[in-house]
Amino acid sequence: MSQMQARTMAFAGILQALAQVQYIARHGDSDTDAMAASFNTIMVTNPEQPEDVYADKDQLRVGYKWILNQLGDGESKDVEMTRYLVGLLALERKLSRSNAALGMLSERINQIHRQLNHFAITDEQVIANLASIYSDIISNLGPKLQITGNPNVLQRPLVQQKIRALLLAAMRSAVLWRQLGGKRRHLVFARKAIVDTAKKNLTL
């Protein structure tokens, strides 16, 4: 797998998780398989190769489609998704510069590993713990991401926890994207190459 392919895969992982955030914030319900795929990426902390992070490649198709939507030549850009993406990448930069936050993150993810001996990754207790990792470590690094949606839906504690857990999953992919050399300027100057790579992955 080339670096461009790996980087585009990680970027699809970010958008796949953020798309679920947007959907849950509006509708309240969620796709358990899609959520599990995103949550599982958090648990792969020492991959031998980038593709090891994404065990469920089918779920990444949503992310690749969002790449075409957001970076392609069409007029259908989603401003809300762009705002989430920009905010998340800004938080990731802060995370990458904080050894203390990275250390705490690693420790807390190890605790979830132990919990998975007894619970499924989409169990409400696990989701609550993933959400608290985001709240305790990521959220405090910079300006909080303002999630918009249905106010009645957003009041539900479980919805809030799912959103935070999915933001943690999006952060996992953002960390990988940067480790693979991803930079915000690529989204402008390497846009065509990213879109072409996403298209190829959708036709496989």
Curated annotation (Swiss-Prot):
Where does the record place it? Cytoplasm; Cell inner membrane
Q: Which Pfam families match?
A: DUF489 (PF04356)
Q: How does it sit in the membrane?
A: Peripheral membrane protein
Q: Which GO terms describe its cellular component?
A: cytoplasm; plasma membrane
State the UniProt keywords alphabetically: Cell inner membrane, Cell membrane, Cytoplasm, Membrane
Organism's domain of life? Bacteria
User: Which PANTHER family does the record cross-reference, listed alphabetically?
Assistant: HIGH FREQUENCY LYSOGENIZATION PROTEIN HFLD (PTHR38100:SF1)
User: Can you tell me which family this protein belongs to?
Assistant: Belongs to the HflD family.
Stated name of the protein: High frequency lysogenization protein HflD homolog
Organism classification: Bacteria, Pseudomonadati, Pseudomonadota, Gammaproteobacteria, Alteromonadales
